[in-house]
Regions:
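Long, hydrophobic alpha-helical segments that serve as membrane-spanning/inserting helices
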Residues: 22-87, 105-206
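Pore- and pathway-forming membrane helices of multi-pass small-molecule/ion transporters and channels
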Residues: 1-17
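Membrane-proximal, non-transmembrane interaction modules
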Residues: 92-100, 170, 206
Length: 206
């Protein structure tokens, strides 16, 4: 059918890049959502093995979908190479977060926990950092990102030697801050057509 045929406009093939850009953005958003749900479980009062294992699976599935959509985008015409290079770096940091979540899931299953107050403070910082990254993906112009500048510096959350769980959380926060910076740069080079310009993303529940 005509809808399935790519068409050229000004020397650029549009169909696949426009659909793939929207999918890449959606999958990046969904990966962050899965990360958030996992961290909530890990830092909950009484994390249970089955929900932890299920959410770890969802985190890995979401990242794999993101990785696959990036690979597809890199093979298609019409994409800005600088944008793709930035997104590849973003996805690399996402993979590091997956590895930290995998390790923290094991710790939580072994009942390696933080004090309730410290867990709550880390959860708040992680959620703010995750939401900043999601907002960077959701809004159409740099001035509408709704960035929250109340992210507590990770090093102020604890004093003295850090537990293994805290070290993982610190690194997650570091990756999220880097991802926000990367996507702010990539935003100026994003595709300016098609599905990418859908104003708000649908939310996928994990």
């Amino acid at each position: 059918s005509q809808a399935q045929m790519p068409f050229a406009d000004g020397g650029m093939v549009w169909l696949w890049p426009q659909w793939q850009s929207g999918l890449l953005r959606q999958n990046a958003h969904d990966a962050l959502e899965a990360d958030q749900q996992a961290i909530r479980l890990i830092l909950s009062d009484d994390p249970q093995p089955s929900p932890l294992a299920y959410q770890r699976m969802k985190v890995n599935q979401a990242h794999n979908a993101l990785f696959n959509s990036l690979n597809q985008a890199m093979q298609e015409p019409g994409f800005n190479s600088h944008y793709l290079a930035d997104m590849k770096l973003w996805v690399t940091h996402s993979q590091f977060i997956v590895e930290h979540i995998n390790a923290m899931t094991t710790l939580a299953r072994e009942h390696t926990m933080l004090t309730p107050d410290l867990a709550q403070r880390y959860l708040q910082s992680c959620e703010i950092a995750l939401q900043r990254c999601q907002q960077r993906l959701e809004y159409d112009s740099p001035g509408e990102s709704g960035d929250l500048n109340i992210l507590e510096a990770p090093e102020t959350l604890t004093h003295g030697p850090m537990s293994t769980l805290e070290q993982h959380l610190q690194r997650v926060l570091g990756h999220l801050n880097t991802m926000h910076t990367i996507s702010s740069v990539a935003w100026r080079q994003r595709p300016h057509h098609g599905v990418w310009l859908t104003r708000r993303l649908k939310r996928t529940e994990y």
